[in-house]
């Protein structure tokens, strides 16, 4: 049978097929997208203009994680077998000690959100910029004797990236086992030669991709946004920095870059290793070595590693922000490069204001993604009208992800206050319960607020109508950003 492509019937059939596929995709969105806003944001355009939205939905909308969930369960089973010979008794004792401490109550429901428990007797150190962070990371790797685990969302082949590469090659030549994991989407500009040089030198390096096979080239919605470094199971790092010169202030338009990391030692490092192991297993079907000390110091602070992702049975990251805001009795200060709260988190912020809580949110004054910046600006204006104190950091680009609740609880990690971190990305955050550490975080944030300009109601009124239109369009698609 010969198809006449010039026949008017052909185009009619083609349009009919596209609309049929649009209906099917719209139904798929209604059944799979977790929020009503996101489902409507996809379903309506798919139903009415499928010829414009089918391909974007294929790229950004697919939400099938059955393979990942199955692999993670298999990884957990294999990890339990592999870890059976390790001495977990000291670690379990720290979990029990944490539950019995007075500070534990300050976390409220937070310990129940994740798979990993709250643990006592950890040591934490605040790293308030890129130089302090990478000086500490490089110094720790220099002293490595057994195993180095490195995971970043972005690795660039620039001055900092090359310095890390050479250091890892040198340690591998000394006999240290080195494992490097990066996100395929976040590190899309990383040349294959960078990874190949590491492999040639004995470093095990792999990309994390949430779907296997050729389709992953087109499906970019789900990203592993975690930043983890663990050295010999004794020293670890977690926070907002990636590997690139811009994180040291090397990007003129965004410099100076403002970000925060934490250096950690203690039993919570087992949780960072477990998170890395799960992601590594998904990428390689193999498990890296896990190192547990035979004993921990008797002095330290309560910490919990909260790993979250789209394969979780509940929306762990979103629920964390909700509980952190709801638990505040005196203050909740949040810094995030993006401010796109869902309805529940936005309502929690408004309620906190009504309770008399000092609610402050610090966001950038410069955009790195213009659509997200526009949507964030509109949400910021609405938050100001609700009584939330919104600030824009002036010196450079603000990328840190920090939450401070009252006088004891702080959270530092990779999660932004936006829908992508809530429901699409794999994130990890370190919760710490300690008055002294919270004081350090407070001192750091006060300095940041001193270098910020508070957003006022006049800023909204002074915004041009065309800009306001752009912001509202950006907000319409914010559930899928």
From Swiss-Prot:
Alphabetized UniProt keyword annotations = Cell inner membrane, Cell membrane, Lipid biosynthesis, Lipid metabolism, Membrane, Phospholipid biosynthesis, Phospholipid metabolism, Repeat, Transferase, Transmembrane, Transmembrane helix
What are its GO biological-process terms?
cardiolipin biosynthetic process
> What EC number(s) are associated with this protein in UniProt?
2.7.8.-
The topology of this chain with respect to the membrane is: Multi-pass membrane protein
Record-linked Pfam families: PLDc_2, PLDc_N
Q: Which domain of life is it from?
A: Bacteria
Q: Where is the PLD phosphodiesterase domain?
A: 220-247, 394-421
Please name the catalytic residues of this protein. 225, 227, 232, 399, 401, 406
Which positions, given as ranges, span the membrane? 10-30, 40-60
Query: Which leading EC class covers this enzyme?
Result: transferase
Catalytic activities: 2 a 1,2-diacyl-sn-glycero-3-phospho-(1'-sn-glycerol) = a cardiolipin + glycerol
Provide the primary localization: membrane
What GO MF terms are annotated?
Answer: cardiolipin synthase activity
Query: One GO cellular component from the entry?
Result: plasma membrane
> Do you know which Gene3D superfamilies this protein is assigned to?
Endonuclease Chain A
Q: Where in the cell is it found?
A: Cell inner membrane
Q: Which family does it belong to?
A: Belongs to the phospholipase D family. Cardiolipin synthase subfamily. ClsA sub-subfamily.
Q: Which HAMAP family match?
A: Cardiolipin_synth_ClsA (MF_00190)
Q: What does this protein do?
A: Catalyzes the reversible phosphatidyl group transfer from one phosphatidylglycerol molecule to another to form cardiolipin (CL) (diphosphatidylglycerol) and glycerol.
Provide the protein name: Cardiolipin synthase A
